[in-house]
């Protein structure tokens, strides 16, 4: 843990570096070159680049972003993952009952090995970008820059940054911006309440993983995209309420670095 927070200029430069690398994955790899390998390599670089950036800011490594190695933090990760998968199932049921989604032809069921490979591939390809974005939009604010946040201020700032980070969706309309902001509220609240970025990763990764598996395995399709976004926003507000209602992490179990810069 650094003895003092980094200067505003140094913190901004560190953030800008990670931001550019992260955005280049979709911008350069996905849109300009249309090359999945380049896109994947840049996303991995965005994740791995967090380590030298943290060192430059005076930290030992990924602890700068709240990615500690405590067993309870990994339990929080697993619980968040399961909770989001349940919420995604609730969204599916609500979408069907509201006429937002419909059931079509069922995709062919993969064999055991193919199915395991599909799940493993989906888990990996959603985990890396989820953690990279969580570092950028939540972990950086949570700990790395040393700001003395209050809980509501951190959650709002992180949700706004998460929404802004989707720069290629600015023209998708207000429904998408609202969906992103509500998702950001829930994910940031999890990171703050349990004093670990793994809380946010569990929810964020779970949501992305559920989407990836849904696209490949589910016969359900979204008929009203805009209504689907609003439904997702509402469900994430419910998820936010659940997070707030759950008990806080015990102070003696939270990572030591949190109290230094947080009220």
Task: Name each region found by the language model.
Residues 8-16, 37-41, 74-82, 119-120, ...:
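Hydrophobic alpha-helical transmembrane segments
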Residues 10-59, 67-70, 75-80, 230-234:
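Alpha-helical transmembrane segments in multi-pass membrane proteins
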Residues 28-35, 62-132, 142, 147, ...:
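Juxtamembrane helix-loop-helix connectors linking adjacent transmembrane helices
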Residues 31-34, 166-174, 222-226:
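Membrane-interface helix caps and helix-loop-helix hairpins in membrane proteins
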Residues 56, 205-263:
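C-terminal membrane module of polytopic membrane proteins
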Residues 132-157, 189-196:
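Membrane-interface helix/loop boundary segments of multi-pass membrane proteins
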Residues 154-162, 199-211, 259-260:
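Central hydrophobic cores of alpha-helical transmembrane segments
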Residues 175-229:
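Functionally important transmembrane alpha-helices
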């Amino acid at each position: 843990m650094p003895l003092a927070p980094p200067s505003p200029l140094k913190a901004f430069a560190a953030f800008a570096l990670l931001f550019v690398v992260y955005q280049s994955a979709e911008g350069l790899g996905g849109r300009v070159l249309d090359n999945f390998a380049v896109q994947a390599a840049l996303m991995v670089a965005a994740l791995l680049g967090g380590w030298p950036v943290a060192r430059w800011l005076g930290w030992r490594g990924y602890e700068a972003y709240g990615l500690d190695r405590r067993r309870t933090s990994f339990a929080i990760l697993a619980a968040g993952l399961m909770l989001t998968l349940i919420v995604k199932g609730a969204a599916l049921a609500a979408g069907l009952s509201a006429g937002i989604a419909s059931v079509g032809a069922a995709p062919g069921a993969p064999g055991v090995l193919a199915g395991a490979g599909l799940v493993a591939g989906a888990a990996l390809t959603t985990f890396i970008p989820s953690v990279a974005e969580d570092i950028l939009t939540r972990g950086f604010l949570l700990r790395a820059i040393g700001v003395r946040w209050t809980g509501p201020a951190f959650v709002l700032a992180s949700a706004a940054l998460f929404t802004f980070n989707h720069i290629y969706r600015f023209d998708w309309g207000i429904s998408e911006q609202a969906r992103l902001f509500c998702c950001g509220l829930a994910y940031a609240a999890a990171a703050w309440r349990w004093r670990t970025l793994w809380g946010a990763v569990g929810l964020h990764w779970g949501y992305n993983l559920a989407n990836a598996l849904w696209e490949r395995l589910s016969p359900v399709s979204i008929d009203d995209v805009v209504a689907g976004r609003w439904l997702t926003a509402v469900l994430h507000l419910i998820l936010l309420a659940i997070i707030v209602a759950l008990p806080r992490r015990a102070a003696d179990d939270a990572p030591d670095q949190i109290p230094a810069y947080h009220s």
